[in-house]
Amino acid sequence: MISFLRGPVAHIGLSAAVIDVGGVGMLVQATPKTLGTLRLGQESTLTTAMIVREDSMTLYGFADPDEREVFEILLTVSGIGPRLGLAVLAVLEPETIRVATSTGDGKTFTKVPGIGPKVAGRIVLELAGKLVPHGTVNGAPASPSAQWKPQVVAAMTSLGWSEKDALASVEKATADSPELISDGNVAEILRTTLRWLGQDGARTSAGRQVTARG
């Protein structure tokens, strides 16, 4: 894997730059912010990630290793490809992404063109626990446990539920789990609520069938 590139900047475009590495022009896709730090003819260093496909090999450039790490973790989300992952970094800072995933704030990701509520909710759900804000201790969520309910409700509304239904579902799903409430783990409470909704939906459907038969 090509971990970084260093050399004079030969070209700067709207979405990519060319770095002259030993006489070879390396085309690197990058965010407008990263491209804005480059100057034609000046030597620059870009942290890179190479994405290999059947018909292509593409280099993506980043300001630092932290930005690359967030990019690579974003690509583990189903439906998020390199272009959309780069679009997320074009709009949101790496730390903002870390905080949003750790607190279940799906609305933050809807600021990115091409990401709607469903995709935003999927990002939050699939990246729960994978991106930890740098300001936390021992991987604890950045927000106090006392504030978990608004965060879970926000994540559910980003998945399509109304705020009223989300709040009611959270309360019912956690009613018999005091330890879950005291821990205030947003990701775990969200998973528990979604599981409860699935079971409740099955029970409701079965009840309707019995009523219809009667």
UniProtKB/Swiss-Prot annotation:
Pfam families: HHH_5 (PF14520), RuvA_N (PF01330). Residues 64-139 are annotated as: Domain II. Residues 1-63 are annotated as: Domain I. Residues 139-143 are annotated as: Flexible linker. Keywords: Cytoplasm, DNA damage, DNA recombination, DNA repair, DNA-binding. GO terms for molecular function: ATP binding; four-way junction DNA binding; four-way junction helicase activity. The RuvA-RuvB-RuvC complex processes Holliday junction (HJ) DNA during genetic recombination and DNA repair, while the RuvA-RuvB complex plays an important role in the rescue of blocked DNA replication forks via replication fork reversal (RFR). RuvA specifically binds to HJ cruciform DNA, conferring on it an open structure. The RuvB hexamer acts as an ATP-dependent pump, pulling dsDNA into and through the RuvAB complex. HJ branch migration allows RuvC to scan DNA until it finds its consensus sequence, where it cleaves and resolves the cruciform DNA. Homotetramer. Forms an RuvA(8)-RuvB(12)-Holliday junction (HJ) complex. HJ DNA is sandwiched between 2 RuvA tetramers; dsDNA enters through RuvA and exits via RuvB. An RuvB hexamer assembles on each DNA strand where it exits the tetramer. Each RuvB hexamer is contacted by two RuvA subunits (via domain III) on 2 adjacent RuvB subunits; this complex drives branch migration. In the full resolvosome a probable DNA-RuvA(4)-RuvB(12)-RuvC(2) complex forms which resolves the HJ. This is Holliday junction branch migration complex subunit RuvA. The lineage of its organism: Bacteria, Bacillati, Actinomycetota, Actinomycetes, Micrococcales.
